[in-house]
Amino acid sequence: NFCSIAFHQGRYITTRSKKSIMIEAEKLTHMPNFKGYIHDIGGPTANFRQPSCMLQEEHGLCKGKKCLAPKPCKNLVANHEEYLDILRSVRQLPGIKKVFIRSGIRYDYLLQDKDDSFFRELVKYHVSGQLKVAPEHCSAAVLDKMGKPHIEAYIEFSKRYFQYTGEIDKEQYLVPYLMSSHPGSTLNDAIDLALFLKKNHIRPEQVQDFYPTPGTISTTMFYTGLDPYTMEEVYSAKNPHDKALQRALLQYYNPKNFALVEEALKKIKRFDLIGTDPNCLVRPQTPNYQNRNNSGNSRNNKNNRNNKNSRGKQNFGGKKQNNYGRKKKNR
């Protein structure tokens, strides 16, 4: 609902022929600066190369319906045979060392293909260390407004991706695209996403804040405050500071965001997530924060009396959090 590619290029998928791709790939091998690496074969969504179903060719695209969200259509045909054939043929050309897929792929479409040949060869031959995918959020309510599949699809894809990666003894990761402040996303939803990222050891280096673009359903929600499909009211964070709070939660681990994260948690009274416990999102940023909030707790008062020597000092003890994934990269 938020992507404007369909307005730029149309909803109907058009593809180059295998012959055209092979001719261009062969030409590359004769260029003096070519090193043997083709960095991408695929469109905006690499694994879309055919009509969604037989009905689409006969009757055209469905109005007001989506092929994959909120659930895959029963008429959807998920097949990667042609795309896989092209990739295999290009790999076999003399002078070609590697063929990567750097365009994003629709993992929800990939999961609908009962033949796992493409999935396995994708992992084995076409990932240059990390693969881009776009779960965008974890909240079902927000994903429904986005027109994206629920997070269970991403979890299943991730599980199989790392399973296949382990079977070939490779070190490869996922780079998830994430979005803050999409219409329908509340501060509670942003906190749920932060907790999901923490639980799954995901530390995104870049996140996208929702920006309204002309013509999209999401922009309609943003400006009207209504879901055009249901006419129900939709909350949108529009104040720059409110948007900053949601964005900071997606990178809760970044020191420059600590103050914003603490403010967001206090705003909706999630004091349980402020502290030194491993399940917390941020350590207290306000001096004597814990003592002030726990002043009625007799056990804490006793501990304070027993720690006279440390009076005036904040105890931020605890295990250092691991930065999971390859250095300077994340999954």
Annotated model-derived regions:
Residues 117-118, 182-199:
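Catalytic cores of alpha/beta
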Residues 52-55, 61-81, 144-146, 150-152, ...:
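Radical SAM enzyme [4Fe-4S]-AdoMet core and its adjacent flexible, acidic
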Residues 1-17:
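Canonical Radical SAM [4Fe-4S] cluster-binding loop centered on the CxxxCxxC motif
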